[in-house]
Amino acid sequence: MKVANGYEYTAIMEKIAPKKLAMEGDPIGLQVGDLSRKVRKIMFTLDVLEEVVDEAIEKKVDLIIAHHPFLYRPTQHIDTTTKQGKMIKKLIKHDITVFAAHTNLDIAQGGVNNILADLLHLQNTTMIEETYSEPYCKIAVYVPENELESVRLALVNNGAGQIGTEYTECTFHTTGIGSFKPGANANPTIGEKDALTSVPEVKIEAIFPQYLTETITKAVKIAHPYEEPAIDVYTLEMQTYKEGLGRVGMLPKKLGMVSFIDKLKTAFAIDNVRFIGDLKTTVHKVAIIGGDGNKFIHQAKSTGADVFITGDVYYHTGHDLLAINLPTIDAGHNIEKVMKGYLKNKMEEQAKILDYEAEFIVSEVNTDPFQFC
């Protein structure tokens, strides 16, 4: 097994939460440290606080992957007598690198908002606000029949073959005869130099978002037995890859608001929420934006949701929500902590595929600043 470096692990993060999905001005990516260093232990956290850094030092962590960037605003100086300055000093002293995936992880398929929606068992989910779009592409690879599975895995393990939110590993195969004549300096896997060779081959096709072109073609070339594999990639004019903030979906059955709030508290492992609206409301359609959703109340209303779930609702936004008759549950910003276990599992899965050797852990520090008395 290989001990990979920080760049190789952030390449996995790019598959999970592509940087291009982030909202404008969001300071994602490297926060502190050296991505060229070898990584043997990775810790996932919602926030980077001094207590989290102390935990990382104690557990000999090499790379912290956080949801919230702690260097969110431009820093003119680092005063090591302050709490944040001490934290940065500790990170540098102990060679701990910090990487953040923020709104890109909120927006990505399978990211924070999908996890929250899944915990509530929402069905037929769609986005609340579209924030990104680009064309879909289709790849066609021609491969000997006995090597089909290795190429198929290279495609689907790198993001090809997803149609909608519920169908993955979607490919189409056709069989035919491939013919080629290797040159004098070629090193053919099949056939002889300067001789025309005909081979039964399979054409495997799959669609993927355009931004994955380089990742997928590189993976296919590695998996393919030929030194010069035949690969076609073309843009699909009729299909567009879209991502956006928040999720809206249907509960399996209607619930009263009080029962739904109880369900939510259990699902998110929280004891209290703030509520705006009529507790007698019946809930079937649910909209959710993890974190601060104050700017998106009208978009949530336009979905026809019976209730909107978010965090950090401002006092005057509460009045606005009453005015537009959108019952709202403020479940707190900390519910986004669900990303820790999700990223741990995804990273372990990808590291196993790539044969990377590392330990993956989640921070045990509760970073929620609020207590209910």
UniProtKB/Swiss-Prot annotation:
Protein name (record): GTP cyclohydrolase 1 type 2 homolog
Binding site for a divalent metal cation 2: 68, 333, 336
Residues that coordinate or bind a divalent metal cation 1: 67, 106, 336
Keywords: Metal-binding
Family note: Belongs to the GTP cyclohydrolase I type 2/NIF3 family.
Pfam family, one: DUF34_NIF3
Keyword presence, Metal-binding: yes
GO cellular component: cytoplasm
GO molecular function, one term: metal ion binding
Top-rank lineage group of the source organism: Bacteria
Oligomeric form and interacting partners: Homohexamer.
